[in-house]
Amino acid sequence: YLSELMDPPARLSVAGLQQLASLEREQAAALRSAWPQIEAERRRQVVHLLMELAEDNVDLDFAAVFFAALEDEDAAVRADAVRGLWEYEGRDLIAPLLRLLEKDEEPEVRVEAALALGRFVVLSELVSLREEHFQQVEEGLRRALEDELEVDEVRGRALEAIGASDRPWVEQAIQAAYESEAPRLKVSALHAMGRSCDGRWLPVLIEELANDDPEVRYEA
């Protein structure tokens, strides 16, 4: 099906795209090699359609395609690739996500990477992730959160992601974000309070249900 992907006039069909599911190692390698040769708009279409197919049928595993797309030169493709891996819990995804969070030039991609790393924070709390792996995730999210040169959207999403952790510094970070003058950080702090499942935040959340800002009320 690679030849059809590389041929812009060729129509993308569901049957054809399904051939990209559960690729063997050699097939995945061939895809990674051919991927940059596919025109940008076509790559955007492919990744978006694969996301839709995977949502409709959870048995379809397009991880190999999404992994290849994480390296795409197009930011929209990279962001969609991260979204497409929303159910993937393999530890081999941690390093690529951290790289995107720390080095990607586009805030949209960094936001998606931060949110995706939150999955591994939850796995750690469920004792389903080794400590060494969690430490990598924790350090990456903390760097993003504490980077005052980073945009608030990314910092806020990093806080939301780490919010499920019971590390002492996380509670302090949530409180600091809640008290900050940055609206995005306050909203993310409320989201993180919910993810923490910590009863100490309940009075704050109840109080914010009466906030004039609909986004604040929604998160509360």
Which residue stretches match the model-derived regions?
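Structural signature of alpha-helical solenoid repeat scaffolds
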Residues: M51, W86, G118-V122, G163, ...
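Amphipathic alpha-helical scaffolding segments comprising HEAT/armadillo-like alpha-solenoid repeats
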Residues: L23-P36, D56-E71, G90-K103, L123-E146, ...
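Glycine/serine-rich loop-strand microenvironments at binding/catalytic pocket rims
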Residues: Y1-A21, A76, D80-E102
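Alpha-helix N-cap/helix-start positions at coil->helix boundaries
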Residues: A10-R11, R25, A40-R44, L60, ...
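Alpha-solenoid HEAT/ARM repeat scaffold
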Residues: R11-V14, R44, H48, A64, ...
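N-terminal alpha-helical scaffold/docking segments in eukaryotic complex subunits
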Residues: Y1-D56
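Extended low-complexity acidic/polar segments
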Residues: A81-E89, L93, L149-A182
